[in-house]
Amino acid sequence: MKKLFLAIVAVSALSSCNTTQPLYSWYNYEDATYQYKKKSTEELHVKMLEQYQKLIEKQKGTRGVVPPGMYSEYGYELYKAGKKEKGLSFLKKEITLYPESEKYISRIIKQLEK
């Protein structure tokens, strides 16, 4: 009986150590965004855009898709950087992937196209 109890305790202890994989991979998103917002230099803007692109291209979370708002944020930043068509296409991808954002993103697109 004592051996059975120890076996159950050991199995439950080992199984509780398993960590779950996050839904989305964020890589260095927070740091890149913070650094750019802190000092808005062209070099930091390029680094931030590279980080966003990496996040979009190499998504390794359990869902396997880009986090909500990422396409729109990347698209908006591209639009501000002068890559208007590419920026608008990413804003539209946000609507495709997350239809619940359509009202909000459509307003942003409408404002940008004025």
PLM feature spans:
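Structural register within alpha-helical repeat arrays
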Residues: 73-74
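Helix-turn-helix repeat elements of alpha-solenoid scaffolds
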Residues: 40-53
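Flexible helix-coil transition and linker loops at the boundaries of alpha-helical arrays
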Residues: 21, 55-65
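Residues that mark the junctions of alpha-helical repeat units in TPR/alpha-solenoid scaffolds
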Residues: 48, 66-67
